[in-house]
């Protein structure tokens, strides 16, 4: 007679073992119809799961985050069933849930084409409409291996063969299709009402480039058509803003395969933006009391052994290079170099805090399949800073860092943040006292700044607690950029010291800090946030001077020179093209201001001003215009003229 306790604390007793579906029906017909799965004593199960003893139970519907995951996982299986129906020789491999959707990898003799995806999706809709019951069964490992080998599914057999002997293997069946899965799944395929296949790509079996290439079909699934349509709209908007496409259109950067994937080439316009970003960064840090370092790109292998990178980070580092009987490696991080600068001389407690910053280029080994434009690269510039301070200075330094972080991010147009504090994990270096004091200092600083934050208990690195700040872009996506990380490990490894007030030697506290993260990645985020229409202070060309005929060429050169002398990035287009063609071309290049020069403007020493949005601002005196533009650039705001 199981006693079922529901999330609201109410209880229901049954005379015999009951399924999750039975309990939902006992509560109400509407809930029974909506039920997708259950959570029994904290574990997700199918609605067919039999409850024999007293238990807590939550009925999972499409309103629950777990319900959406069940829908997506079940839709991945629906995809696999459709592929097997249409292409019987295809072998199924894995089909996990990912952010906003799912994928499934197939081994097939040829690549899937877009028209294949249309056929597969149509078959999925037929299978969903058929409302096929989904049932779970179990086998032992060896039986399951034999079963899938008999089906010609060698990849599934390999997956199961890697599972420890003695473990029970669960299988799910819908129609004639059977697949390996832990579950849970929806009760029937009719619960899958809103899905879309989005793309196909190559993927190596088990992510290993030495293995065979598979076909990965991506898709998305939602509780209803409205949510699906909303997501597809966001997807289309993200595609419109894709930094790789815009970067090519605006001639900002490229990845040259002749040089190697994941290595960024900054073109002149992109370099202009990078210089603007970096100059602002240097100015802000100078004002905040930082000093700047420049450090090498390689170091002796012994340094990476001392820092721990050789033991714990070697998979992300490039192989050592032998030279003069020494082994050198490209740096994956700047931190040990800053430590060496600190150790170059003995410091007093009066010297602290020391705030050192560097735009340091680092190199990390990435699988080619993981590379993605500017967002995931092999060589990138980190806006690193390290603060060396006393324990009693932690809170004040964290406050200063938060002030600087928010000011910098807001200057780039990001005002919406998610803040997370990660605390001590089970295995950690440093005393309980220092962890408690440091964590309390981080919390106090966040609260003094009035920042809402979530706490990830036990989610910190083994060497110290940290604060992560995620920004939201124009279409609501989150990007991890800023990190504040305390480190109790490197000061110990490198035996860092300062002379305390009582003449004793003590370890300094080391704070790692990045505001932008990777400059390349942050640039990619900026491109997508603004869809290439950068605010005036960041635009690679802020003003484009356009002539109607060659009679205005000298005046155009003069106008461009005068603007450049005011620190405004201005170019002159003197080509023998129609003015309408020039206006359209530079509008597509997202130039904030177009100055059209004809005979009248030349005679009156004025300029006709247009914005990239197409607004005609009329004739203006150049001095007046340059004053206003220079003011806007200096304030790093959006142009009031364009607004």
Swiss-Prot record:
Its EC number is 6.1.1.3. GO terms for cellular component: cytoplasm. Its cofactor is Zn(2+). The keyword Cytoplasm applies. Keywords: Aminoacyl-tRNA synthetase, ATP-binding, Cytoplasm, Ligase, Metal-binding, Nucleotide-binding, Protein biosynthesis, RNA-binding, tRNA-binding, Zinc. The gene is thrS. Residues 242-535 are annotated as: Catalytic. It catalyses: tRNA(Thr) + L-threonine + ATP = L-threonyl-tRNA(Thr) + AMP + diphosphate + H(+). Zn(2+) binds at residues 335, 386, 512. Belongs to the class-II aminoacyl-tRNA synthetase family. Binds 1 zinc ion per subunit. One of its GO terms (biological process) is threonyl-tRNA aminoacylation. The keyword Cytoplasm applies. It is found in: Cytoplasm. Homodimer. This is Threonine--tRNA ligase. Its main location: cytoplasm. Catalyzes the attachment of threonine to tRNA(Thr) in a two-step reaction: L-threonine is first activated by ATP to form Thr-AMP and then transferred to the acceptor end of tRNA(Thr). Also edits incorrectly charged L-seryl-tRNA(Thr). It is an enzyme of class 6 (ligase). GO terms for molecular function: ATP binding; metal ion binding; threonine-tRNA ligase activity; tRNA binding. Residues 1-61 form the TGS domain. SUPFAM superfamilies: Class II aaRS ABD-related (SSF52954), Class II aaRS and biotin synthetases (SSF55681), TGS-like (SSF81271), ThrRS/AlaRS common domain (SSF55186).
């Amino acid at each position: 007679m199981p006693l079922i306790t529901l999330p609201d604390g109410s209880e229901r007793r049954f005379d015999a073992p009951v399924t999750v579906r039975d309990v939902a029906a006992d509560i109400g017909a509407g809930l029974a119809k909506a039920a997708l799965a259950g959570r029994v004593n904290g574990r997700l199960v199918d609605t067919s799961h039999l409850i024999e003893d007293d238990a807590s139970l939550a009925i999972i519907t499409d309103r629950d985050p777990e319900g959406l995951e069940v829908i997506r996982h079940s839709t991945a299986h629906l995809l696999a069933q459709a592929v097997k129906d249409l292409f019987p020789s295809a072998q199924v491999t894995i089909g996990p849930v990912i952010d906003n959707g799912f994928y499934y990898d197939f081994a097939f003799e040829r690549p899937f084409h877009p028209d294949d995806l249309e056929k597969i999706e149509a078959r999925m809709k037929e299978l969903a409409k058929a409302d096929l019951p989904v049932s779970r069964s179990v086998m032992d490992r060896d039986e399951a291996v034999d079963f899938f080998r008999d089906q010609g599914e060698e990849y599934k057999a390999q997956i199961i063969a890697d599972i420890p002997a003695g473990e029970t293997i669960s299988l799910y069946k819908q129609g004639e299709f059977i697949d390996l899965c832990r579950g849970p799944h929806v009760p029937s395929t009719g619960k899958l009402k809103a899905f879309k296949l989005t793309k196909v790509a190559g993927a190596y079996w088990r992510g290993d480039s030495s293995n065979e290439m598979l076909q990965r079909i991506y898709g998305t699934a939602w509780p209803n058509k409205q949510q699906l349509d909303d997501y597809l709209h966001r997807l289309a908007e993200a595609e419109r803003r894709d930094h790789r496409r815009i970067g090519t259109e605006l001639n900002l950067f490229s990845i040259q395969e002749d040089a190697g994937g994941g290595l960024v080439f900054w073109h002149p316009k992109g370099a202009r933006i990078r210089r603007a970003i970096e100059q602002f960064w240097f100015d802000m840090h100078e004002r905040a009391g930082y000093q700047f370092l420049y450090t090498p790109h390689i170091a002796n292998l012994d340094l990476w052994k001392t820092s721990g990178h050789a033991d714990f980070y070697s998979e992300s580092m490039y192989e050592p290079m032998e030279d003069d009987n020494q082994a050198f490696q490209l740096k994956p991080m700047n931190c040990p170099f800053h430590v060496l600068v600190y150790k170059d001389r003995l410091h007093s407690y009066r010297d602290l805090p020391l705030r050192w910053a560097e735009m340091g280029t680092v190199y990390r080994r990435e699988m080619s399949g993981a590379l993605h434009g500017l967002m995931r690269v092999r060589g990138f510039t980190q806006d690193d800073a390290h603060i060396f301070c006393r324990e009693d200075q932690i809170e004040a330094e964290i406050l200063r860092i938060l002030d600087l972080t928010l000011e910098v991010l807001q200057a780039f147009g990001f005002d919406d943040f998610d803040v997370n504090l990660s605390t001590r994990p089970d295995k950690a270096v440093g005393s309980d006292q220092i962890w408690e004091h440091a964590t309390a200092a981080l919390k106090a600083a966040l609260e003094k700044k009035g920042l809402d934050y979530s706490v990830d208990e036990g989610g910190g690195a083994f060497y110290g607690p940290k604060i992560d700040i995620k920004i939201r872009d124009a279409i609501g996506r989150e990007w991890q950029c800023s990190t504040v990380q305390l480190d109790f490990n490197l000061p110990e490894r490198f035996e860092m010291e300062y002379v305390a007030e009582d003449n004793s030697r003590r370890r300094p506290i080391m704070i790692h800090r990045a505001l932008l993260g990777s400059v390349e990645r942050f640039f990619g985020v900026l491109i997508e946030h603004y869809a290439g229409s950068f605010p005036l202070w960041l635009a690679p060309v802020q003003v484009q001077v356009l002539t109607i005929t060659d009679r205005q060429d000298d005046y155009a050169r003069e106008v461009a020179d005068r603007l450049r002398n005011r620190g405004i990035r201005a170019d002159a287009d003197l080509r023998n093209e129609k003015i309408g063609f020039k206006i359209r071309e530079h509008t597509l290049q997202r130039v904030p201001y177009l100055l059209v020069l004809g005979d009248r403007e030349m005679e009156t020493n004025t300029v006709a001003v247009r914005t990239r949005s197409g607004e005609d601002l009329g004739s203006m005196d150049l001095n007046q215009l340059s004053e206003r533009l220079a003011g806007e650039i200096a304030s790093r705001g959006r142009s009031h003229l364009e607004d």
